[in-house]
UniProtKB/Swiss-Prot annotation:
Domain tr-type G: 178-347
This protein's name: Translation initiation factor IF-2
MF term (GO), any: GTPase activity
HAMAP family in the record: IF_2_B
Organism per entry: Clostridium perfringens (strain 13 / Type A)
Keyword Cytoplasm part of the UniProt annotation: yes
PANTHER family named among the record's database cross-references: TR-TYPE G DOMAIN-CONTAINING PROTEIN (PTHR43381:SF5), TRANSLATION INITIATION FACTOR IF-2-RELATED (PTHR43381)
Gene (name only): infB
Sorted UniProt keywords: Cytoplasm, GTP-binding, Initiation factor, Nucleotide-binding, Protein biosynthesis
Alphabetical list of InterPro entries matching this protein: EF-G-like_DII, EFTu-like_2, IF2_II, IF2_N, P-loop_NTPase, Small_GTP-bd, T_Tr_GTP-bd_dom, TF_IF2_bacterial-like
Annotated stretches, region: G2: 212-216
Region (G3): 233-236
Length: 679
């Protein structure tokens, strides 16, 4: 049965602790010694009924208060007759209450208790805690110490939590003013992203130094027709998606660069899907128009195959033919960016405390932690205290994109700052707080929260818990990434999955492509809370590590029907995961030997885990599964063995398969029975 302390109940009922003690003893016959005594919840409930606001009960409280007042007056008269400095030990003062945060140093606790530090340390030792004067202790430990001194402790609610800052919605419409748009450039490798950025920078960056030398801080601003544009100089869509995975939606417009002589390429498709998933408007820059084989109409045709119809052909996608080399139509492209941003009516309040996102960060040998911050709302000033993810600091110096020292930066302006305690991660949100102590406390709270979340079960969507999440209303849309060995399979799967959509949940294929499952696929899945499905393909080592780190579910199949049935069963709550595939180990083929009447024997090196004789195996060539069978034999030197661990060489043969080649990967796995889950 739970209990409550007298002072806690007194605070809840808004009556003095002494009044409550008298009521307990006189009216209920409950023996209590002082405000730290505990009473049963049943007694507390009865007292709440008695003292819950009626006039009679108010009179009862007033009666006891009058008696107490008389006692106090009598005690005061006696006190005058005593020597100066003596105390009335018989008069119990009202409850002494202190408030502390989730943690407090021993020195601060001693000051709050008004006790010598040595006494507090001794009390800590008696409670089994060894702590030095500047060491932090948690709230529970501080409460035990305070209890020894008969002092009540309340846990102070953080005045400003990061979540409250993030969720601030009290926007005054009249304070909003136009802000510059933030642009990211994406596209396939070698299609001219960097060249285009350089062309824009050279033609439009306002030079403040001889030669127009600018400092690379990951972002820069340009002037177009009196308007400012902010460009993020990030390495393609990987950084864009990594930021989005951390909750940082900072881009207003995306320039998709497509080479006029090359057309749509795999990374172009990825970039298109990333933009669609983020719901960010796109402008297509058809680059390399100076080349002989340039064919913009072919690019426009290929764009339509991915749901992007340009304005020339009756669509709403702006396409501008440009040349980064000759700077042809660069001005037109920038004007189109301005037009697109004007349609969005981008606004921010420059008068409030600054909030924004980390674009990039590094540890500089001479300057310490250096971060490029993009202000998204408010104005950032030198000397401001900020919380950035799980780090904090006070801005000691601030530089613009030309390396010039500045004192403040408004919305959509990138700045490089010094003064952070640690190097933050790209995509971390920053918020200005009232002082450095508040920032430190919030950073510590965030670190503790991250530590606890690392032990908690991942809340990423998975087939096993999909139905229950749908019922709870936490999943309205199931996002899927499809990878297969041939394009026909990708199209068939996309069509079949999208037909499964119901009123409760919509199935959406956000990306489909040919090839092995890569780390980029996992990053997109993490950002979009998606499931990755592979057909006759496997994830590479980086993808496996990323999926485990980010909690992304990767499912692989050999038969399309099985995948459709799995997702369908999950949606109706009938998925029955009786067996789970467990990868035992992988080995790389380094030599092959053909032996008459036996077949092909492979010499391999075990990369991870172990190979077990008679285990199920799959042969993987360039990321694609080409055969599934069993290990027919397993030898170490000339001896038959049951298993070979990672780091050792071995010889083996695969049952009914002789087309083994050097460089093939053998993946051994087993199907383990797992306990059935109720969905």
């Amino acid at each position: 049965m739970s209990k409550i302390r007298v002072y806690e109940l007194a605070k809840e009922l808004r009556v003095p602790s002494k009044v409550l003690i008298n009521v307990l003893m006189d009216e209920f016959g409950v023996e209590v010694k002082n405000h730290m005594s505990v009473i049963e919840d049943e007694d507390a409930a009865l007292i709440k009924e008695l003292l819950a606001g009626s006039e009679a009960n108010s009179e009862l409280v007033a009666e006891y208060e009058a008696e107490l007042a008389e006692e106090v007056n009598n005690a005061a008269k006696k006190k005058k007759k005593r020597k100066k400095g003596s105390e009335d030990d018989n008069l119990e003062q009202d409850v002494e209450v202190i408030e502390i945060g989730k943690t407090i140093t021993v020195k601060e606790l001693a000051e709050k208790l008004n006790k010598p530090v040595n006494d507090v340390i001794k009390t800590l030792i008696f409670t089994g805690v060894m702590a030095a004067i500047n060491q932090e202790i948690d709230f529970e430990t501080a409460e035990k110490v305070a209890e020894k001194y008969e002092v009540a402790v309340y846990e102070k609610e953080e005045e400003n939590t990061l979540e409250e800052f993030e969720e601030e919605t009290d926007v005054e419409e009249e304070n909003l003013a136009k802000r510059p748009p933030i642009i990211t450039v994406m596209g396939h490798v070698d299609h001219g992203k960097t060249s285009l950025l350089d062309a824009i920078r050279k033609s439009k960056v306002t030079s403040t130094e001889a030669g127009g030398i600018t400092q690379h801080i990951g972002a820069y601003t340009v002037e177009v027709n009196g308007e400012t544009l902010t460009f993020l100089d990030t390495p393609g869509h990987e950084a864009f998606t990594a930021m989005r995975a951390r909750g940082a939606q900072i881009t207003d417009v995306v320039i998709l660069v497509v080479a006029a002589d090359d057309g749509i390429m795999p990374q172009t498709v990825e970039a298109i899907n990333h933009c669609k998933a983020a719901n960010v408007p796109m402008i297509v820059a058809i680059n390399k128009m100076d080349r002989e084989g340039a064919n913009p109409d072919r690019v426009k045709q290929e764009l339509t195959e991915h749901g992007l119809v340009v304005e020339d052909w009756g669509g709403d996608i702006i396409a501008v033919p440009v040349s980064a080399k000759t700077r042809e139509n660069i001005d037109t492209l920038l004007e189109m960016v301005l037009l697109t941003s004007e349609m969005q009516e981008l606004k921010a309040d420059a008068g409030r405390k600054a909030k924004g996102t980390v674009v990039e960060a590094k540890l500089d040998k001479g300057r310490g932690a250096v971060a490029t911050l993009l202000v998204q709302n408010g104005t950032l000033h030198m000397g401001d205290s900020i919380i950035v993810g799980s780090t904090y600091g006070r801005i000691r110096a601030m530089f613009d994109d030309s390396g010039k020292k500045i004192k403040s930066a408004g919305p959509s302006i990138p700045v490089e700052v010094l003064g952070l305690s640690e190097v933050p991660a790209a995509g971390d949100r920053f918020t200005v707080v009232k002082d450095e102590k508040t920032a430190r406390n919030m950073a510590e709270a965030r670190k503790e929260k991250i530590r606890q979340e690392s032990f908690a079960t991942s809340h990423r969507v998975s087939l096993e818990d999909l139905y229950s999440q749908i019922k709870e209303g936490s999943v309205k849309e199931l996002s899927v990434i499809v990878k297969a060995d041939v394009q026909g399979s990708v199209e068939a799967i996309k069509a079949s999955l999208e037909k499964l959509s119901t009123d409760d949940v919509k199935v959406r294929v956000i990306h489909g492509a040919v090839g092995a499952i890569s780390e980029t696929d996992i990053t997109l899945a993490a950002a979009s809370n998606a499931i990755v499905i592979g057909f006759n393909v496997r994830p590479d080592n980086n993808a496996v590590a990323a999926s485990e780190r980010d909690g992304v579910e990767v499912k692989t199949y050999r038969v399309i029907y099985d995948a459709i049935e799995d997702i369908k069963s999950a949606m109706i709550g009938m998925l029955d995961p009786e067996y789970k595939e467990v990868v035992l180990g992988t080995a790389e083929i380094r030599a092959t030997y053909k032996i008459s009447n036996v077949g092909t024997i492979a010499g391999g090196y075990v990369l991870t885990g172990k190979l077990v004789r008679n285990a199920d195996v799959r042969v993987i060539r360039e990321g694609i599964v080409i055969f599934e069978s069993k290990l027919a034999s397993l030898k170490r030197f000339k001896d038959d063995v049951k298993e070979v661990n990672a780091g050792y060489e071995c010889g083996f043969s695969v049952e009914k398969f002789n087309d083994i080649k050097e460089g093939d990967i053998i993946e051994a796995y087993t199907m383990e029975a797992v306990q059935r889950k109720e969905l």
